A protein has these predicted regions:
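Beta/alpha (TIM)-barrel catalytic core signal, keyed to glycine-rich beta->alpha loops juxtaposed to Asp/Glu
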Residues: 137, 141-330
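Active-site mouth loops of central-metabolism enzymes
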Residues: 32-42, 99-114, 137-141
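Structural motif corresponding to the early beta-alpha repeats
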Residues: 65, 84-108
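Structural motif
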Residues: 50, 54, 123-124, 157, ...
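N-terminal binding-site loop/beta-alpha segment at the start of enzyme catalytic domains
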Residues: 1-89
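Short, acidic/polar
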Residues: 39-51, 108-124, 172-176
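Active-site groove signature of glycoside hydrolases
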Residues: 121-141
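Short beta-strand segments at enzyme active-site cores
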Residues: 58-62, 91-93, 128-133, 163-164, ...
Length: 341
């Protein structure tokens, strides 16, 4: 297996068009879900400084981050950092998750989304976001109502583009079709889960995005840190996504998704490939996501600035063809199921 070659000078982040729009974004995006819980405000500001200095000027947040009792705190932290820097950042956020106990405080209804966008703008300290995304599909609200509301948010100047997250391919196809039929703002992007241990979106969602010109901005490229190489199968994590630090419900979710013998067996083989290429498992894993031509930008999370060092290197890494084949062969089964199956 040949060694890796870089296509850009160190510290430079490649840019690309945001799907079929005229927007240009870095191929790496900073996720902010850790802000306010795993990373306090001081550390979060250091993380944003590190990212921006490296050219990662695309930030993604959500009104429910960091989830639990602290909903909204991540946006507040981002908003305070943004003061005086707003025009330097492509800013995305999401709505639809539960912001309170009432049923109308979540979902894709007109009431909730109009309330949610105003709340996000207030916390972020800005009068618009570049990309406003529906965080989750809401089967209880008519899709036309949700799409018309997102269109109204763009028309009001509160967002430049709209996107969705966590959508199944058939629902995404229907949503895209309805925006065309109703002459509404088109869906510019989709934010799915995607990594070497979860490849199911390759079967339907990625081809759909390619056909319709949607940008693809995957989250979880390191499988909640499992593909960072910092965990072993015998660990009992006391911090991070697999621990109670993030709340038991979230920890249970990530443990169910990834913490399995099969996943660690795969990681052992992935680590060998990374070593042969002279790179880290984390860099290899993100570079693999970015090597998919349908992927626009990969979302990176961090709970301290040092964690970005490895992951930022992925922007400069061109995987050789034989490495791509080896990685594809090794993880082929994850196109049909995840590590729990």
């Amino acid at each position: 297996m040949t060694g890796c070659e870089t296509s850009h000078e160190e510290g430079n982040v490649q840019y690309t068009t945001f799907g079929a729009t005229g927007l240009t974004v870095p191929r790496l995006c900073l996720g902010t879900a850790t802000f306010g819980r795993q990373a306090d405000e001081t550390v979060a500001h250091q993380i944003m400084d590190t990212a921006a200095e490296a050219g990662v000027t695309f930030f993604d947040s959500a009104d429910i981050y960091p989830m639990g009792a602290e909903v909204g705190r991540s946006e507040e932290i981002v908003g305070r950092w943004l003061q005086g820097k707003r025009d330097q950042i492509i800013l995305a956020t999401k709505a639809g998750g539960p912001m309170g106990p009432a049923r109308w405080q979540q979902g894709g209804s007109r009431k909730h989304l109009l309330d949610a966008v105003d709340g996000s703008l207030r916390r972020l300290g800005t009068d618009y976001v570049d990309i406003y995304q529906l965080h989750f599909d809401d089967p209880d609200t008519p899709l036309d109502e949700t799409l018309a509301t997102l269109d109204a948010i763009v028309t009001a100047g509160k967002a430049r583009y709209i996107g969705v997250s966590n959508f199944l391919a058939y629902r995404l196809a229907r949503a895209a079709g309805r925006t065309e039929t109703l002459h509404l703002t088109r869906i510019a992007s989709v934010q799915p889960r995607y990594n070497l241990l979860f490849r199911q979106i390759e079967r339907e969602l990625l081809p759909l995005a390619a056909e319709t010109g949607m940008a693809v901005i995957p989250f979880n490229p390191l499988a909640a840190g499992l593909l960072s190489g910092k965990y072993t199968r015998d660990d009992q994590p006391t911090e991070g996504r697999f621990s109670a630090q993030v709340g038991q419900r979230i920890a249970d979710l990530y443990n169910e998704r990834y913490w399995h013998t099969k996943a660690f067996d795969t990681i052992d083989q992935l680590t060998k490939i990374a070593s042969e290429l002279g790179t880290s498992l984390a860099t290899l894993s993100i570079a693999w996501v970015l090597a998919n031509p349908t992927v626009t930008s990969a979302i990176l999370g961090a709970s301290r600035p040092a964690q970005l060092t490895d992951t930022l290197a992925a922007a400069d890494l061109d995987l050789p063809d034989d490495a791509k084949v080896a990685l594809d062969d090794l993880t082929q089964e994850y196109r049909w199921g995840d590590a729990a199956r």
